[in-house]
From Swiss-Prot:
<comment type="function">
    <text>Involved in the binding of tRNA to the ribosomes.</text>
</comment>
<protein>
    <recommendedName>
        <fullName>Small ribosomal subunit protein uS10</fullName>
    </recommendedName>
</protein>
<comment type="subunit">
    <text>Part of the 30S ribosomal subunit.</text>
</comment>
<comment type="similarity">
    <text>Belongs to the universal ribosomal protein uS10 family.</text>
</comment>
<keyword id="KW-0689">Ribosomal protein</keyword>
<keyword id="KW-0687">Ribonucleoprotein</keyword>
<dbReference type="GO" id="GO:1990904">
    <property type="term" value="C:ribonucleoprotein complex"/>
</dbReference>
<dbReference type="GO" id="GO:0005840">
    <property type="term" value="C:ribosome"/>
</dbReference>
Length: 16
């Protein structure tokens, strides 16, 4: 599922 990929992307994006 892409949900897991989105979660990882969100986590990386939240690393501002």
């Amino acid at each position: 599922m892409a949900k897991e990929k989105i979660r990882i992307r969100l986590k990386a994006y939240d690393h501002r």
